[in-house]
Amino acid sequence: MGMKIIAGDDVIVISGKDKGKMGKVIKVLKKKHCGKDVSFAIVSGVNVCRKSVKATQKSDGGIISVEKPINLSNIALFDSTLGIQTRVGYKFIGEKKVRFMKSSGKVIE
């Protein structure tokens, strides 16, 4: 089965410290943990942590902001036409399988 959320989607955080924040998915990460598939997403402006970087010959040291991954169960696709979170469904248009928003029925490009 395909991924419900992919890079480039507009999402909203539905639980956690950043609840209610919106952003665009930069990257989706999949890995195995204890025999199960676990998926995370890096979302712009969400779960931002500060990191100390040591000075090297090429770059100066300092404190930078880094976006950390967030579990896919904590985010939902955002429907901009209705302004609410929505679930993702799949349907066939001709021979092609496409994703669509269940709240509005709009096909996701």
Curated annotation (Swiss-Prot):
Q: Which keywords, in A-to-Z order, does the entry hold?
A: Ribonucleoprotein, Ribosomal protein, RNA-binding, rRNA-binding
List the InterPro entries: KOW, Rib_uL2_dom2, Ribosomal_uL24, Ribosomal_uL24_CS, Ribosomal_uL24_KOW, Translation_prot_SH3-like_sf
Output the Gene Ontology cellular-component terms: ribonucleoprotein complex; ribosome
The protein, known as: Large ribosomal subunit protein uL24
Q: Which family is it part of?
A: Belongs to the universal ribosomal protein uL24 family.
HAMAP family, alphabetically? Ribosomal_uL24_B
Which source organism does the UniProt entry give? Ehrlichia chaffeensis (strain ATCC CRL-10679 / Arkansas)
What is known about what this protein does? One of two assembly initiator proteins, it binds directly to the 5'-end of the 23S rRNA, where it nucleates assembly of the 50S subunit.
Subunit structure, interactors included: Part of the 50S ribosomal subunit.
Q: Which PANTHER family match?
A: MITOCHONDRIAL RIBOSOMAL PROTEIN L24
Q: Which Gene3D superfamilies match?
A: 2.30.30.30
As one GO molecular function, the record gives: rRNA binding
**NCBIfam families, per the entry:** rplX_bact
Name any Gene Ontology BP term: translation
List the Pfam families hit by this protein, alphabetically.
Answer: KOW (PF00467), ribosomal_L24 (PF17136)
